[in-house]
Amino acid sequence: MAIVLIDPESQIAMDAVTGAVAEWSEDVVTLDVMPLYEKVEELEQYVNDMMRAMDPSTTTWGTLPGREGVHETAGFLTNFAHGFVIGTMIVALVAFTLAAVYKLHALRLLGL
């Protein structure tokens, strides 16, 4: 924390970072909050990244350039694969059910 003494006799000092002018005394403890501000800014970047993650057309903070829309593509392919698997299972269930019904019908016609 940089402090500039404006007038040592009347003990007036200026904070070089904020530009605040105040009375200065040696018995007052000062705290450098700039590292705290840096951590808060880093946390804000993480929060903004989490908010951007909700939008599928954007990319996250640490990704390589040119990956815009990758979440939309991944979501489409995932939903397509799930739909294909579930649709195949339903068609197989219907086919096996119809085969069983026709087999029972054929056995009844044969008298077995």
From Swiss-Prot:
Record membrane topology: Single-pass membrane protein
Keyword Plastid appears in the UniProt entry: no
GO cellular component terms listed in the entry, alphabetical order: plasma membrane
Residue spans crossing the bilayer: 80-100
Compartments, as annotated in UniProt: Cell membrane
UniProt subunit comment: The complex is composed of 8 subunits; MtrA, MtrB, MtrC, MtrD, MtrE, MtrF, MtrG and MtrH.
Functional note: Part of a complex that catalyzes the formation of methyl-coenzyme M and tetrahydromethanopterin from coenzyme M and methyl-tetrahydromethanopterin. This is an energy-conserving, sodium-ion translocating step.
Annotated protein name in UniProt: Tetrahydromethanopterin S-methyltransferase subunit B
